[in-house]
Amino acid sequence: MSPARPRWLSSLLLLPLALALLAPAPADAATRKAQKKPVASQARAKPAAKPAAKPAAKPAARPASKAEQLQRLYADYWEQSLQLNPLQATFQGDPRWNDQLPNYLSAEFRQRNRDFTAQWLAKVEAIGEDGLAGQDLLSYRIFVRNARDALESERYPAWMQPINQFNSPATLVAMLGSGSSAQPFKTVQDYDNWLRRAGQVPALFDQAVANMEQGMAAGVVQPRPLMEKVLPQLDALIRPTAEQTLFWNPITNLPAGFSEAERQRLTADYRRMIEGQLLPAYRRLRQFIAERYLPATRDSAGLGALPDGAHWYAFSARQSTTTDLTPEQIHQIGLDEVARIHAQIRKVMKQVKFRGSMQKFFRFMQEDKRFQFADEQALLAFHRGLEPKVMARAPELFSLLPRAGFEVRAVEPWRAQSAAGGSYMRPSGDGSRPGVFYVNSYDLPTRKTWDAEDLFLHEAIPGHHFQLALQQELEGLPAFRRYGGETAFTEGWGLYAESLGRDLGLYQDPYSYFGYLQNELWRTIRLVVDTGLHHKGWSRQQVIDYMLENSASSRTDAVAEAERYMAIPGQALAYKIGELKMQELRRKAQAALGPRFDPRDFHALVLKDGSVPLDVLEAKIDAWIAAAQAAD
């Protein structure tokens, strides 16, 4: 998993363009030479002096070009989008609205959001793309495409399903208030900001309940297994006293420089806020889900079972993959790729002299204790040890390296049961927070040594950390491109990065290489089961059975992944579709350029413009190949 921002945040905030965030570089100002005033000549005696010449009139200012007009629009759009979505600003390290929590689930906010998107789309389209070229044309087309997709998404009632085990305002608030996420707790002002923001949580939770009630009336409800997972998440956050909650962490870690008076005030204020506002809001939400919503949940698993669900899923698939592939086509691609990867796994079985069926080999890889970590610290230490090893070889494949810092952290216990095995949170825009690779140690025996190298390559280096950190550091791009992104590109790059393991000194034994094949297989299976769920009407159990029969996944992972696909329809398609396109483009470049092909040049070209739709990426690579051939 990854995200250009935390993936759940996009759906929670209903962002205007699914774009993201920081101020764009200002447009290059046209250089103008100042008009020199005439130099007065030395006085000379003359019968009559001529009147002094009038200063030459300044030339009229040059009208702004289309590109300059658009750059200003993007900058204004960005600033106003941060004001509309202060949580986005917080996650990007902009502290100006850290005390605000808009009721982003309300009908009023959704309408404001819709109007905002339509307004800025109209402004951009009024300028048009005629005469634009290069990055200016690319920015225009990405902005317009994403804005239109955002408006089209309003046709579908996602707001009636504000909570599942992946997307939840309850989880968002817990992350912010824990003291270890994007909400800063360094100054007295920071602490007061969270007090004010937390005071707005009850209204948000009550709105979530109201939305779910409307969903119950309309028949738009979550599958039961997803909401059963939400209850233990809430139970982990609800405690008898403030001191027993994770919301007390900022008080436990009060900075030493605070005065005694401030420490006492904040301690008292936080206790009142947690026990008087947060805990009652969490208890009301839990009671509603357990007593009223859970009995109304559905037995079906896929989006196709909901009103207009077939169109909803087709839109989700198109938006996720940035292609026009139909769910049926994607399903068949998945089946074909599963067969191809199975053939590669059989070669590994032969190499290690394993006798038996592929299913027996899968069980061996899951059950043999040699592939287990001793404890959580051993798991974390292994991943931390991969960074220097991979970075030592990275310059052989990459000429662009990010400046942002990076670290490995354990997934917090309260969300570990439903979290993926690994995930990435991008660094803050101001450099105050590094990129973070979260490693999950829940159900530790299922976290395999053969899986670790591949996971690191995908989530960390050279996967999401390289791509997302570099994207933020690109100069001259509008903010919506530096901090936004296409899932097919971002996750496609993560999966493509896994294929570089041997070149980076990893996959040195057949079992680790099997880990790479298994994870490629896992992402390929997603094409089959995601479309199976939402297009073909598969049940949750059918998805779990297919994954267990065709991969080395543990039952824990199979259940978690099946429920993930149920919660986020279409998102899982992006990985393999994006990776297939990147591998196709690399093969095309290698065939065309022969010995002149340099992976550093190819990777720089892929990454230097940030995340783009797959058709745009293909056009860019084709133009590069054509230019190289023309130079011969």
Where are these regions (language model features)?
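Bacterial N-terminal signal peptides that target proteins for export
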Residues: 1-13
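Bacterial N-terminal signal peptides
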Residues: 11-23
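Sec/Tat signal peptide C-region and signal peptidase I cleavage site
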Residues: 25-29
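N-terminal maturation segment of proteins
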Residues: 30-632
